Amino acid sequence: MPLDAFVCVTCGTQYPPSLTPPDRCPICLDERQYVGHEGQRWTTLAEVASGRAARIEELEPGLVAVGTEPGFAIGQRTLISHGLMWDCITLLDDRAAAAVQAAGGISAIAISHPHYYSSMVEWAERLDTRVLLHEADREWIMRPDPRVELWAGERLRVGDEHELVRLGGHFDGGTVCVWRAGASEQGCLLAGDLVQVAADRDWVSFMYSYPNMIPLPAREIRRMREVIETLRFESVHGAFWGQDIARDGKRKVLASADRYLAALSR
């Protein structure tokens, strides 16, 4: 009988197959996540899929989002763009996989930071592809696999249309993706939650820890702003439903960094 690869209920990270659940989830024990009042809890992919379904929406021409309803764990979505699967969700059912493949097939999965590693190995096996993670976050890989490839440095081209950029902030290896053909060839920033789109979609914010509300220091915001200033993009798409900026995205992100710095200096 095959062993279950247990999944953390709080963060959605999947661990290697085992007879019993792990004793702890290091990702949730880190101050950028949390262990809930009920303590460490575990589930399986089959249980995640029971009573849940894939939510699929086109965000702009050539960009499709796939999420989970009802939500699970952190609740992020994955974005599919011209052969790239950006970020990952835990749910892997036939409809979710079909939606990803229908969006053009996948040549690589790239993930912004460890909170969204989720069931990346299962997805990579299902899609017969590789997973690209920044080497600065290697300690947070809870399920090692030959399909997981680490990249180093500040930028990595993925095909003709995408570039991974190490932005840092939330995690040392925190990565954003620039899709050159997005926003009618003006460029699109796939931001995860390293750049968190605010409720009015006119501003964004940045955090070291979202659940524990720990801000980033001014020196890190200044460094991130310098990186963002070098990028070309018009639209921004974040990790969660509704976190989409259709126009003037770069100006809004830079203005938000300035506002953040001003608040820290008061």
Which residues does each PLM region occupy?
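Short beta-strand micro-motifs in enzyme catalytic cores
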Residues: 4, 62-64, 75-79, 173-175
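Pre-active-site segment of Zn-dependent metallo-hydrolases
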Residues: 65-108, 143-147, 153
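Short, ordered loop/turn segments at secondary-structure junctions
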Residues: 114, 136, 241
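N-terminal juxtadomain amphipathic helix
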Residues: 3-71
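Short amphipathic alpha-helical segments
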Residues: 98, 121-124, 145, 202-203, ...
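Metallo-beta-lactamase
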Residues: 2-23, 30-33, 47-61, 83-92, 121-173, 214-229, ...
